[in-house]
């Protein structure tokens, strides 16, 4: 499993630990990933995604999982999230007809 958020694309960052004497040693900043089950109101399905903690509050702020994923850019979504977005769009258009 990659260390990357499936909805925002946030991944591992690299930097330095800097001591008091200004010695620099390389380190990795890992995202705070959580495996979360999101419920779609449109498809009435549950989807388990690996997202960072900040993304969870962003989804709530956007008005739910469906609203967030429909606004999200396809370039940052994982292939799994893109498939979910496609399914939501198809279901939404089928219900509107």
Swiss-Prot record:
Keywords: Ribonucleoprotein, Ribosomal protein. One of its GO terms (molecular function) is structural constituent of ribosome. It comes from the Bacteria. GO terms for biological process: translation. Pfam families: Ribosomal_L28 (PF00830). GO terms for cellular component: ribonucleoprotein complex; ribosome. InterPro entries: Ribosomal_bL28, Ribosomal_bL28/bL31-like_sf, Ribosomal_bL28_bact-type, Ribosomal_bL28_sf. Belongs to the bacterial ribosomal protein bL28 family. HAMAP family: Ribosomal_bL28. This is Large ribosomal subunit protein bL28.
